[in-house]
Amino acid sequence: MGTRYFLALFLILLVLGFKVQGVAMAQEDEADSPGLLTRMQESLFSYWDTAKAAAQDLYQKTYLPTMDEKIRDIYNKSTAAVTTYAGIFTDQLLSLLKGDQ
């Protein structure tokens, strides 16, 4: 079952790679236009800035000090738990890969 996902992912990446190569070859003639990566980066940055501004606006509209304390406390507890479990997972993965020596 895992190999199906890897095969599907490989095929998707292969198709995207050929698509990007085709776009890159077509854009070689247009030297003064920005590259695909630059356009994608600018687009992602604009989406990120828009989302960040909307989140800040929503936060400022609904700011409650007691709720803010609760959210900070939940965040601290959850990051501590994730750090602990990530360490356990890393140890298990390393022992699995390293094996008995």
From Swiss-Prot:
Keywords associated with the record: Chylomicron, Glycoprotein, HDL, LDL, Lipid degradation, Lipid metabolism, Lipid transport, Secreted, Sialic acid, Signal, Transport, VLDL
An annotated Gene Ontology molecular function: phospholipase activator activity
Gene Ontology CC annotations of this record: chylomicron; high-density lipoprotein particle; low-density lipoprotein particle; very-low-density lipoprotein particle
Main location: secreted
Keyword Nucleus: no
Segments for region (Lipoprotein lipase cofactor): 78-101
Signal peptide: 1-26
GO biological process terms, semicolon-separated: lipid catabolic process; lipid transport; positive regulation of phospholipid catabolic process
Pfam family, one: Apo-CII
Lipid binding: region residues: 66-74
UniProt subcellular location: Secreted
Modifications made to the protein after synthesis: Proapolipoprotein C-II is synthesized as a sialic acid containing glycoprotein which is subsequently desialylated prior to its proteolytic processing.
Family: Belongs to the apolipoprotein C2 family.
Function recorded in the entry: Component of chylomicrons, very low-density lipoproteins (VLDL), low-density lipoproteins (LDL), and high-density lipoproteins (HDL) in plasma. Plays an important role in lipoprotein metabolism as an activator of lipoprotein lipase. Both proapolipoprotein C-II and apolipoprotein C-II can activate lipoprotein lipase.
Protein name: Apolipoprotein C-II
Encoding gene, per UniProt annotation: APOC2
